[in-house]
Amino acid sequence: MISLPGLTIAAGRPEWAGKIIRTFAQYLDQGMLPNVFPEVGEKPEYNTVDAILWYFEAIRAYYAATEDQTLIRQIFPALVDVIEWHQRGTRYNIHLDEDGLLYAGVPGAQLTWMDAKIGDWVVTPRMGKPIEINALWYNALQIMAQLAQVVGQPQEDYIRLATQTHRGFQRYWQQEKGYCVDVLDGPEGDDDSLRPNQIFAVALPYGDLAGPPLLSAQQQQAVVDTCSRSLLTSYGLRSLAPDHPDYQGSYGGDSLQRDSVYHQGTTWGWLIGPFVQAHLRVYQDSDQALSFLQPMADHLHNHSMGSLSEIFEGNAPFRPRGCIAQAWTVAEVLRVWQVLQRHTHHSSPSPLIR
């Protein structure tokens, strides 16, 4: 779902996006999408909290590109069901808490994109209320309010839920540190590790839709500046700040060694997309935002044959690691490049169509 807007819509193939959205709708179950599709005779696996939330963003991007009301009318009842499942609770203790924030997780499960697991060891446990999950949830509620308007259905419930989430989201902000908590209400309390997930609280388009941004303008700038100082490398954002005691800046060794550092300092290429979009939103400087993509262009020509790598080491010279052709990375570079092109030419359609 993260890759869908970039690999289809930004690449000039929105009809593919529509087909994929329809196909995935057939696999919705208890308000969730599978992260592993079945082989013949097997069942899909549902162990991700964010896939369904990225599905909403993919739908928003598709409608922005096509204004295909037919598809929206077909899938809208299923989207209503998704929201209701999250309100009452679904697998893995995923549920909407009283503070308006989504809680997700049970011991031994890895439900976010930071999903490395070795045997029974979850390397990056994020049980609780991960920040990007709640930024995505707020985004989904704003999208639902807009889509309800498209199909002529009431939007008040989604606006009410979004207002609750906005209020609860203020708990993430740490004034004394100038950045956001990564996970609230975990088994051992809040996790204030400096990780890149907070960039989605600035980058996602919810502020352009029905409700206010989750963070103030000053807070957004602080998040972007903090990520620039501590997480930004030539090819993306580090998964953990270098001054954290668990930081690992090199990636190598056997599978155990590699998985143990996968999200503990390794640079992820796909995160360059939300970072560039967040930077553009805060500073409105398309030339500077575009400059962040230049190393990826160099990498495209000098390292891989027509594609972009999955990850890079957290320490200079940021050697490429992982798979040499990663859909997330390619998709996010394409998507944010298109965003920059539109910004440069000042083509700004209606709020939902961005």
Please provide the spans of the model-predicted regions.
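Solvent-exposed loop and edge beta-strand segments that line ligand/cofactor-binding
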Residues: 1, 39-52, 119-135, 182-212, ...
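Aromatic-rich carbohydrate-recognition surfaces in CAZymes
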Residues: 4-111, 130-134, 138, 266-280, ...
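Short coil/turn linking the two alpha-helices of tandem helical-hairpin repeats
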Residues: 11, 63, 145, 149-152, ...
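Alpha-helical positions within canonical tetratricopeptide repeat
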Residues: 15-16, 71, 78, 154-157, ...
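Catalytic cores of carbohydrate-active enzymes
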Residues: 34-35, 87, 91-98, 138-251, ...
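Acidic/polar loop-and-plug regions of large Gram-negative outer-membrane beta-barrel proteins
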Residues: 106-123
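Generic hydrophobic alpha-helical scaffold/packing signal
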Residues: 224, 228, 252, 259, ...
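In a subset of proteins, long, contiguous C-terminal domains/tails are tracked
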Residues: 316-354
